[in-house]
Amino acid sequence: MELSLTTSIALATIVLILYKLATRPKSNKKRLPEASRLPIIGHMHHLIGTMPHRGVMELARKHGSLMHLQLGEVSTIVVSSPKWAKEILTTYDITFANRPETLTGEIIAYHNTDIVLAPYGEYWRQLRKLCTLELLSVKKVKSFQSIREEECWNLVKEVKESGSGKPISLSESIFKMIATILSRAAFGKGIKDQREFTEIVKEILRQTGGFDVADIFPSKKFLHHLSGKRARLTSIHKKLDTLINNIVAEHHVSTSSKANETLLDVLLRLKDSAEFPLTADNVKAIILDMFGAGTDTSSATVEWAISELIRCPRAMEKVQAELRQALNGKEQIHEEDIQDLPYLNLVIRETLRLHPPLPLVMPRECREPVNLAGYEIANKTKLIVNVFAINRDPEYWKDAEAFIPERFENNPNNIMGADYEYLPFGAGRRMCPGAALGLANVQLPLANILYHFNWKLPNGASHDQLDMTESFGATVQRKTELILVPSF
């Protein structure tokens, strides 16, 4: 009797599993705690059907805040507590300073030459210096203040023009506003193909979330083609590259004084002067970082802040009262007006605790074998720091799942990675270099949305009916659009 193809594959898989079990070498080495695993896929079956950050958090609560995950071929250690985060990101920071290679980084990020994915070494150190001194300095972030103020005011006018009492998609409005702010900061103006550019960036962000088969089986190159991932990424990259080339070509025609340089001006100046070893592809990779990562993280944070406030009317009333008392009927908000509003800042800090932009941070990779608390960690082992779990650790946070901005009153926790129980932007050498720009793109938009309008759910729904389901991508977004009704 002939066997069907499905039956043949199933039998072959069973034989392979039994062979792997029988021939697996024994080891006397101290092993990190881990869940039960299967041959070939390792621990992936524990994460099926879950948000990765939540699934990993639940495994850590069962097996320990320093545990091992086998993700296909990739050996991974997961850190889920402030204690271990501090140990690894201080004592072993340089050991785990590399980034694992990914198919997305290879194709989309111009062979991993952007700031986020570049391997640790001289090129990355120069990029980091470039960010600190030029691209993302306090002075440079401040120079974009007028852009933020203009685009926030444009959003206010658009909402008012739509009419009081009519539902609008705040998700769409916020994303568009942040994208325009960053587009103007990067290129000096809203680009003519901005809608297409934004859609391509959104697609890239969708492709970079979760655990991808191409990255968990890196040696199985046929899977890159079989899954269709390589073809999809290549197609996206071609469109993206054409658009950025057009932007750069148009930009060469214009001139800017150094005092008013856009991000692209800075990069092209450094490239042309040979001050810094930048190629045309390097410039494009860095610009993509600035626009892509910045748009997604800031817009998600503003959305989550408003979502949490809708579900917590007491906090909403308190933050709006603070804004309206301080601004006293002022029409257009300037950043100086909101620098000393404590409750607004508490709301932002609590939002970042519950909804860190990158809940699993960006994975790192071990550069050399290391002994970690008696455990032998092999070269190229992947490191995941679950900031989502750390920020909700009940040992450090009372009522950890609740939205309570007041918990940060008189709380010295540093938002920039100095306190390891609170790591919204990561910590150590590979901490997010754009934190200051990201915060600026959250604070003013949020203040405008809360100051100018009252908000409620459509169709008479009560505040506790707001769907807070997550959708995992490069960042954790709301699964459903935030549709609210403004009144003014």
Curated annotation (Swiss-Prot):
Glycans are attached at residues 260, 379. It is a single-pass type II membrane protein. Pathway: Secondary metabolite biosynthesis; terpenoid biosynthesis. It is found in: Endoplasmic reticulum membrane; Microsome membrane. Keywords: Endoplasmic reticulum, Glycoprotein, Heme, Iron, Membrane, Metal-binding, Microsome, Monooxygenase, Oxidoreductase, Signal-anchor, Transmembrane, Transmembrane helix. GO terms for biological process: sesquiterpene biosynthetic process; terpenoid biosynthetic process. GO terms for molecular function: germacrene A hydroxylase activity; heme binding; iron ion binding. The keyword Ion transport does not apply. One of its GO terms (cellular component) is endoplasmic reticulum membrane. Heme binds at residue 432. Optimum pH is 8.0. PROSITE patterns: CYTOCHROME_P450 (PS00086). The chain crosses the membrane at residues 7-23. Residues 1-6 are cytoplasmic. Involved in the biosynthesis of germacrene-derived sesquiterpene lactones. Catalyzes three consecutive oxidations of germacrene A to produce germacrene A acid. Could also catalyze the three-step oxidation of non-natural substrate amorphadiene to artemisinic acid. Can use beta-elemene as substrate. This is Germacrene A hydroxylase. It comes from Cichorium intybus.
